[in-house]
C-alpha cells in the first residue's frame, strides 16, 4: 500500500476489552482531513459505549453488536493481525460461516461494518468494511405451520382443569388466532384487552416498537379462554401482565418469552408433533397460512400479521402455491 506522506499519518490504536482482561494493539493508517487526528486513542468500553450510542439501537441490538465487536477484536488478536484490511474482514466472515447460522453471520458483519463506518467518521481508522456482504439468508420460512386439524389436536390435549392449564390454553389460542409473536404475548397487559366498536381487541407492543399502536381482534372463543385464565387471578390489576409465571422461582411475575416457547413446545410434543421446525413461532406461520387458505387477500393478511412489507406476506402465498403445484405428480403419471 503506497502512503502519501502529505495526507496520511501513522498512528497507534489501543483496543482494550477489559472484560476479557486482554489488550490488543493494532497499528492503523488513518486519513488526515481538515484537522489533525490524535496520535493515539484507546478503544475501551467507553469507546464502545460511544459507538453503541451512535447507532441508537434497541437493547437487544446493543447486546448483539457489543458481542460482535468484542468477538471481532478477539479474532484479530488470535490471528496476530495488527493492521486489519478488507481481506481480513472477509476472512473473518468466512470463518464465522463455518460455525454460525447465516442470520448470526449477517448481524455480526453488519455490526463490524457500522463500527468501521463510525471509526472513519471519528478519524480513527479508514472504513475498510464498506460494502462487505454478510451471509445470504434464505427467504424460505424455517418453521413449519400446523393444519387446522393439527391445531385442534394440540388444543384438545391441553388440560384446562387447573389455573396453569387454563393459562396455557389461552396463550396457545391467542397466538394461533392472532398470529402473535412470543414477545408480544410477554409484553401484553390486562388493560391492553379492550372493546373497539363491536369487537374485543388486544393492543400490542410489537417487535422493535416502543408503544402499543397496533391491535388484533380477539375472537369470542379466544376471549373466553383469556377471561377464564384471568378469573384465577382475583388480585390482578388492569396494569398487571396478561399472563404470569406459575413456577416456584418467578411465581406471579410477567411470563417470560422462554416460558411461552416452552408452553407451546410442550403442547406440540404432547400432541405428537415433535419437530425442530415446529415451535412457538410456528403458530404465527399457522395464523398467516390459514388466513390465506381461508380466502383472505394479501392486503388483509399483511394488515393482520403486521407485516411492514407485503413481500413478506407474499412469501407465504408463494409457499402455498408451490405446495399446490402438481408438476411432480404429473411427471410421475406420465412415466410410471
State the predicted function of each range.
Residues 2-4, 8, 14-336:
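Conserved catalytic core of the tyrosine transesterase superfamily
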Amino acid at each position: 500500500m503506497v502512503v502519501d506522506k502529505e495526507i496520511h499519518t501513522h498512528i497507534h490504536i489501543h483496543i482494550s476489552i477489559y472484560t476479557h482482561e486482554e489488550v490488543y494493539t493494532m497499528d492503523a493508517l488513518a486519513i488526515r482531513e481538515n484537522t489533525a487526528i490524535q496520535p493515539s486513542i484507546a478503544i475501551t468500553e467507553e469507546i464502545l459505549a460511544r459507538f453503541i450510542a451512535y447507532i441508537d439501537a434497541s437493547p437487544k441490538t446493543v447486546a448483539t453488536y457489543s458481542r460482535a465487536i468484542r468477538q471481532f477484536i478477539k479474532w484479530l488478536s488470535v490471528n496476530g493481525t495488527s493492521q486489519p484490511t478488507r481481506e481480513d474482514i472477509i476472512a473473518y466472515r468466512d470463518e464465522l460461516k463455518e460455525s454460525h447460522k447465516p442470520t448470526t453471520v449477517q448481524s455480526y458483519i453488519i455490526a463490524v461494518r457500522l463500527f468501521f463506518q463510525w471509526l472513519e467518521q471519528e478519524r480513527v481508522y479508514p472504513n475498510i468494511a464498506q460494502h462487505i456482504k454478510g451471509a445470504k439468508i434464505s427467504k424460505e420460512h424455517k418453521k413449519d405451520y400446523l393444519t387446522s386439524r393439527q391445531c385442534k389436536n394440540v388444543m384438545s390435549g391441553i388440560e384446562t382443569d387447573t389455573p396453569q392449564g387454563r393459562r396455557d390454553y389461552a396463550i396457545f389460542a391467542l397466538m394461533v388466532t392472532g398470529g402473535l409473536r412470543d414477545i408480544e404475548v410477554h409484553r401484553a397487559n390486562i388493560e391492553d384487552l379492550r372493546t373497539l366498536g363491536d369487537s374485543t381487541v388486544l393492543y400490542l407492543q410489537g417487535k422493535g416498537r416502543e408503544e402499543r399502536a397496533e391491535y388484533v381482534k380477539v375472537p369470542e372463543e379466544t376471549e373466553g379462554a383469556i377471561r377464564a385464565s384471568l378469573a384465577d387471578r382475583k388480585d390482578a390489576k388492569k396494569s398487571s401482565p396478561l399472563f404470569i409465571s406459575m413456577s416456584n422461582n418467578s411465581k406471579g411475575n410477567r411470563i417470560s418469552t422462554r416460558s411461552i416457547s416452552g408452553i407451546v413446545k410442550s403442547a406440540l410434543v404432547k400432541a405428537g408433533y415433535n419437530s425442530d421446525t415446529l415451535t412457538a413461532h410456528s403458530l404465527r406461520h399457522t395464523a398467516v397460512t390459514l388466513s390465506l387458505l381461508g380466502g383472505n387477500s394479501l392486503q388483509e393478511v399483511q394488515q393482520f400479521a403486521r407485516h411492514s412489507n407485503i413481500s413478506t406476506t407474499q412469501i407465504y402465498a408463494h409457499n402455498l402455491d408451490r405446495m399446490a403445484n402438481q408438476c411432480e405428480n404429473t411427471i410421475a403419471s406420465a412415466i410410471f
